[in-house]
Amino acid sequence: MGNDIEFNVFQKCWTISNDFGLNTDLLETNLINLGIVISLLIYFGKGVLSNLLRNRKLAISNTIRDAEERYKEATQKLEQAKIRLEQAEMKARNIRTSGLSQMEKEKKDLIDGTNGDLRRLEDSKNATIRSEKQRAIEQVQQQVSRSALERTLETLKNCLDNELHLRMIDHNIGLLRAMESVTD
């Protein structure tokens, strides 16, 4: 009889059937079933889970590595862009400085050239004025001389007689002889 009870208990806990099955009723399951299921899950799931975790870890590390490489490339490109920007700014300053100095030089050259042209024009104007003044003076002198000679001749014609005329000629001849003896 003791065996019958044990067999009945065994039969109640373990259902003997043709197919394998798990009892999903938590109240009817026992610790052995739970241990088997957990150990099977750990045994078979360990490889799958470790593969999944390893693949995920590799994917994350690859993503991080790629992100770090892109960050380094972006940093290098940023540094190169900063260097090019500084070079461009320096070149722009040099161009601006040389442009300003060239502009000042050309301005000075233009002012100097204009001043030179003004001086030459002023000198030309003054020379023209002097020559015109001299010509006017000479014309006036000629007219005055001509007028004086005409009046003198007129006066002499009216006042001179032959005797006065002869005395004047003798006097001038005497002056010429005196000058001749002084020069010898």
From Swiss-Prot:
Q: Which GO terms describe its molecular function?
A: proton-transporting ATP synthase activity, rotational mechanism
Q: What main location does UniProt list?
A: plastid
So where does this one cross the membrane? 31-53
Question: Keywords, A to Z?
Answer: ATP synthesis, CF(0), Chloroplast, Hydrogen ion transport, Ion transport, Membrane, Plastid, Thylakoid, Transmembrane, Transmembrane helix, Transport
Does the keyword Repressor belong to this entry? no
Any Pfam family matching the protein: ATP-synt_B
Instruction: Give the UniProt entry's GO cellular component terms.
Output: chloroplast thylakoid membrane; proton-transporting ATP synthase complex
Note whether Nuclease occurs among the keywords.
no
Instruction: Describe its membrane topology.
Output: Single-pass membrane protein
Which PANTHER family does this one have?
ATP SYNTHASE SUBUNIT B, CHLOROPLASTIC
Q: Which NCBIfam families match?
A: PRK07352.1
- State the remark under miscellaneous: In plastids the F-type ATPase is also known as CF(1)CF(0).
Subunit structure of this chain's protein: F-type ATPases have 2 components, F(1) - the catalytic core - and F(0) - the membrane proton channel. F(1) has five subunits: alpha(3), beta(3), gamma(1), delta(1), epsilon(1). F(0) has four main subunits: a(1), b(1), b'(1) and c(10-14). The alpha and beta chains form an alternating ring which encloses part of the gamma chain. F(1) is attached to F(0) by a central stalk formed by the gamma and epsilon chains, while a peripheral stalk is formed by the delta, b and b' chains.
Described purpose of this protein according to its UniProt entry: F(1)F(0) ATP synthase produces ATP from ADP in the presence of a proton or sodium gradient. F-type ATPases consist of two structural domains, F(1) containing the extramembraneous catalytic core and F(0) containing the membrane proton channel, linked together by a central stalk and a peripheral stalk. During catalysis, ATP synthesis in the catalytic domain of F(1) is coupled via a rotary mechanism of the central stalk subunits to proton translocation. Component of the F(0) channel, it forms part of the peripheral stalk, linking F(1) to F(0).
Output this protein's name: ATP synthase subunit b, chloroplastic
